[in-house]
């Protein structure tokens, strides 16, 4: 189990990403636009740097929904490999079963 504080930190990051998503997208559009003047581009870069660091989606970490484990995460199921195996053995994942050949 991950510490509760780590889960809370990830939840806070997710909230910040959602809050600043439109603002970040607008600033990045100005920066990447070839029609933007150098002054406008530079102002957009400074404004982007002034935003909270955790508002960037790249700082988020995928975690298991049940345990909060950061490694061995399978995006399709939202679970870590360990919890996915346990759920599969209990028959809770439709269409998934232990391999046998």
UniProtKB/Swiss-Prot annotation:
InterPro entries membership: Ribosomal_uS14, Ribosomal_uS14_bac/plastid, Ribosomal_uS14_CS
Keywords from the named record: Ribonucleoprotein, Ribosomal protein, RNA-binding, rRNA-binding
Gene Ontology CC: one annotated term: small ribosomal subunit
Gene3D superfamilies, sorted: 1.10.287.1480
GO process terms (BP): translation
GO molecular function per UniProt: rRNA binding; structural constituent of ribosome
One Pfam family recorded for the sequence: Ribosomal_S14
Superkingdom in the source lineage: Bacteria
Function statement: Binds 16S rRNA, required for the assembly of 30S particles and may also be responsible for determining the conformation of the 16S rRNA at the A site.
Oligomer and partners: Part of the 30S ribosomal subunit. Contacts proteins S3 and S10.
Family: Belongs to the universal ribosomal protein uS14 family.
Protein name: Small ribosomal subunit protein uS14
